[in-house]
Amino acid sequence: MAPLKLNSRNLSQIFAAGKSLVKVPTYQRNGAVKEGIVHIGVGGFHRAHLAVYVDRLMQEQGVTDYAICGVGLQPFDSTMRDALASQDNLYTVIERSAKGSFAHVIGSINSYLFAPDDREAVIAKMANPDTRIVSLTITESGYYYNENTHELQKEHPDIQFDLNPVNENKPRTTFGFLYAALERRHRLGLKPFTVMSCDNMQKNGSITRHMLESFARQRNPKVAEWIAEEGAFPNAMVDRITPQTSATDKTALAENFGIEDSWPVVTEPFMQWVIEDKFSDGRPPFEKIGVQVVKDVHAVEQFEKHKLRLLNGSHSAIGYPGQLAGFNYVHEVMEHPLFSKFVWQMMQQEVKPLLPEIPGVNIDDYCNTLIERFTNPTIMDQLPRICLNASGKIPQFIMPSIAEAIWVTAPFRRLCFVAAAWFCYIKGIDDSGKAFEVVDPMLNELQAKARAGGTNPSELLSIKNLFGDDLRTDPRFLKEVTKAMEDITRDGILKTLPKYID
């Protein structure tokens, strides 16, 4: 039987053909529901995480006023627009593990707006009273957050453009759109919508608040004051490994489940979301569908710290050295005995001792779960995805552990090796001399500094919006990173790794 094109009309046939291996939405969509969530940045992670939770709300709890309107701000988002439009905004989540795979058609995205076509439509949608939450997955670089000063990058050309009142109705950045919509709601006497970051950053809600308030103060102090007093920016920890979708994944979906989907999502069974209970205009009952809703922001921060430093820090330890060594996938790296020992020892000896205890959480169990997830061969998690946009990741995932270790005189050699591997990775040449693509919003500056510095990290460490003065001037850190860079450059990753394994 030929695969069925994914659309609303074919859902019942897709369900019947897939038997127990395929789930489809049975709730009402389109005009029968309100779009209470506007989501900026509809990529793989959003479709495997927040959109799945909202699908559960609609399917299991009968929620009808929190469907999602997706928004794409960038020209490349036209690909997502076209993919969703061709199948009534439906898509398939393929969940894979060693136990097998199953497919879940998600219907929580009810519509999609492409900002380059109509920026006013996006502003009007966010200003609509039905919109209670505007959620974000815009990656670290989308926040224009200076890691060194902890302030908005007001000098950035896109921020400068959006701060000009002449451009209020044609913004480029997320903050330009948020401000324009909130200013309109302020004039209309409406409550501000909750701005809910779903990005993988520590204190994501607090950073979002600070950046938006800083932006708003430049435009209208009264609106900024209203946002500060009435707005809500919950902090959250999000987790689900979501590799890039390949042509092979689409073919497997058609052959194994009978679904023709132009852009499915592949992911793992594990999914977690811890969010602060801070909303300005209501929220759905997230806690009823597996979300950990907590009153205390401190609890969120502790979960965030565990996840960012253990999971994402380990991903960095797998990604940059792994790509330099010529590997392609996360599970391939972890199958190598040197890497598996290195990652485990870094977690146990250098990261874990610096982490706070969380009641009810066993850190060793969490570490074992991470190893199990990293070694899952079925999701084929690509190293280039792990390595993407490192300038927004390394300062969060690796450098804070190094800084704390220096402060308390704890071991940090393996963490320095990871930092050194990234510095070498920036040049885009692996240990066999093969070139690979480096994708980073700061690529030109990073590569210029990397070439100028050679095996000396000082040039890269001089980038002040990435690295603080505490690391830049610490002789122990400089010594460890320089030595690791020299060894990696001379001998390669696999010959250098044994020096970092007990």
Curated annotation (Swiss-Prot):
Signal peptide: none annotated. GO terms for molecular function: mannitol 2-dehydrogenase activity; mannitol dehydrogenase activity. It catalyses: D-mannitol + NAD(+) = D-fructose + NADH + H(+). Its EC number is 1.1.1.67. NAD(+) binds at I37, V38, H39, I40, G41, V42, G43, G44, F45, H46, R47, A48. Keywords: NAD, Oxidoreductase. It comes from the Eukaryota. Belongs to the mannitol dehydrogenase family. Monomer. Catalyzes the NAD(H)-dependent interconversion of D-fructose and D-mannitol in the mannitol metabolic pathway. This is Mannitol 2-dehydrogenase. It comes from Aspergillus clavatus (strain ATCC 1007 / CBS 513.65 / DSM 816 / NCTC 3887 / NRRL 1 / QM 1276 / 107).
